[in-house]
């Protein structure tokens, strides 16, 4: 008969083995983005949104970080296994700016889903260690954190066993959604994230509230308590940014909408309004754009953080990206429409920007797109603004993505004009171009393509500051691949 100690040892060993088996550290032989869809529509557009979504969603950031010390851009993405029904692989690779080569990607883990909401994000600490944060879509799957064994090295990652404080007790930090992670040499990690709360809504006790929050950690292992930013009705989707101000302080900004508490359906389908909050002391205090102190969490629709009321015009607000000028003033991009379903009936789909000039917000239309998820990313270089987005609505209209185009902003005219096409004559739609942290001129955007109306292979790409596009090889041999312009 087995003793209690033997049984206990076997149980503990099996748990440890299961944890260790999560970490794969396997080399892949190419770059394959996950293909994903949500919401069948039973019409020609087939899905609410779909395609190659290896760098989705807008609320995950960053997917890539440039290191001047290593002279490499490290990037992660939602990869696809080679199974008939591909599983989501969390993969990491780098582009070497000296040799102009990309490494073979390392498969850190298999997320055991095809849900692109579980896509990873990446960070590099002040010692050069690479961190991969494996997010989750809600509470049905766990989240993970991995750290490279060596600085600036992707050969081997080890599983971190993080904890956080909850009600004064130390708990496993094993679930986080919609993570945007930033690292500060002095204070460590700052994460904007979402957690799901049930039983708190007026309409539908089983429906979750997507609660916007933040969390911090000095070392990536021991994390603070979750501190809620917004608890308005059914919750929020937030995007964020960070900038080093001229006074040396790190400013962290959250831009978010709110989801109405609806009697039928999901409030996220009626996301509206745009709110702004900032902190310059790593989350100790928060202010609105007027530098007025705001107490958290926000609980009312009309609150001190509101900068744009889209609900009064019955318009939705899909927030994209945020970037800063040399003074630390922000610009964010968003798409407004009249409904969640794809197709012309909910148009016009207007891609817009909001810029804070130090006193007021200026809202400007960039152009019309054809889908709520036509994400665009913003750049500020040499005192000028530009925006990269799938604004050419081909080859598949009224679906996620399209052909990428670069737009330039004129301060004098206060308007956007088309600068140049980035992708052309594509067979699949390109979507979710993402800006790296500390981006280098050779690697300024990273994205995937995919057929939006049926399952397909999905390729990954990056582009430079000249608008030249470099496909990442779907399959290759050797440890490195010399990139070639498309």
Regions found by a protein language model. Name each.
Residues 1-21:
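Bacterial Sec-dependent N-terminal signal peptides
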Residues 20-486:
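Extracellular, repeat-based ectodomains that mediate carbohydrate processing or recognition
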């Amino acid at each position: 008969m087995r003793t209690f100690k033997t049984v206990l040892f076997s149980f503990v060993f099996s748990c440890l083995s299961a944890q260790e088996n999560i970490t794969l550290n396997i080399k892949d032989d190419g770059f394959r983005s996950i293909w994903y869809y949500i919401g069948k529509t039973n019409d020609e557009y087939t899905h609410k949104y779909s395609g190659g979504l290896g760098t989705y969603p807008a609320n995950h950031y960053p997917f890539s970080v440039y290191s001047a010390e290593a002279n490499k851009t490290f990037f992660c993405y939602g990869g696809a296994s080679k199974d008939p029904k591909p599983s989501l692989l969390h993969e990491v690779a780098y582009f070497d700016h000296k040799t102009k080569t990309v490494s073979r990607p390392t498969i850190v883990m298999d997320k055991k889903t095809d849900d692109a909401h579980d896509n990873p994000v990446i960070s590099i600490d002040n010692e050069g260690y690479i961190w991969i944060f494996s997010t989750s879509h809600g509470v049905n799957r766990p989240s993970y954190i991995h750290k490279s064994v060596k600085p600036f090295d992707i050969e081997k990652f080890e599983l971190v066993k993080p904890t956080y404080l909850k009600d004064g007790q130390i708990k496993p930090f094993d679930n986080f959604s919609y993570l945007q992670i930033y690292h500060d040499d002095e204070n460590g990690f700052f994460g904007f994230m979402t957690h799901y709360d049930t039983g708190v809504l007026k309409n539908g006790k089983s429906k979750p509230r997507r609660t916007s929050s933040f969390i911090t950690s000095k070392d990536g292992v021991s994390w603070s308590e979750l501190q809620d930013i917004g608890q308005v009705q059914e919750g929020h989707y937030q995007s964020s940014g960070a900038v080093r101000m001229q006074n040396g302080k790190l400013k962290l900004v959250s831009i978010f909408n709110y989801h109405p508490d609806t009697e039928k359906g999901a409030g996220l389908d009626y996301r509206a309004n745009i709110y702004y909050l900032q902190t310059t002391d790593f989350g100790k205090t928060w202010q609105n754009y007027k530098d007025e102190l705001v107490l958290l969490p926000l609980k009312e629709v009309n609150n001190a953080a509101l900068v744009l009321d889209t609900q009064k015009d019955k318009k939705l607000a899909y927030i994209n990206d945020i970037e800063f000028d040399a003074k630390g003033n922000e610009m964010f991009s968003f798409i407004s429409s009249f409904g969640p379903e794809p197709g012309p009936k909910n148009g016009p789909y207007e891609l817009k920007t909001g810029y804070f000039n130090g006193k007021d917000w200026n809202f400007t239309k960039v152009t019309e797109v054809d889908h709520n998820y036509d994400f665009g990313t913003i750049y500020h270089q040499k005192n000028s603004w530009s925006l990269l987005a799938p604004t050419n609505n081909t080859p598949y209209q009224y679906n996620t993505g399209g052909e990428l185009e670069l737009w330039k902003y004129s301060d004098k005219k206060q308007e956007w004009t088309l600068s140049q096409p980035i992708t052309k004559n594509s067979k699949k739609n390109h979507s979710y171009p993402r800006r790296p942290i500390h981006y280098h001129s050779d690697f300024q955007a990273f994205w995937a393509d995919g057929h939006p109306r049926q399952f397909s292979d999905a390729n990954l790409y990056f582009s430079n500051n000249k608008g030249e596009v470099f496909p990442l090889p779907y399959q290759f041999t050797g440890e490195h691949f010399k990139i070639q312009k498309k």
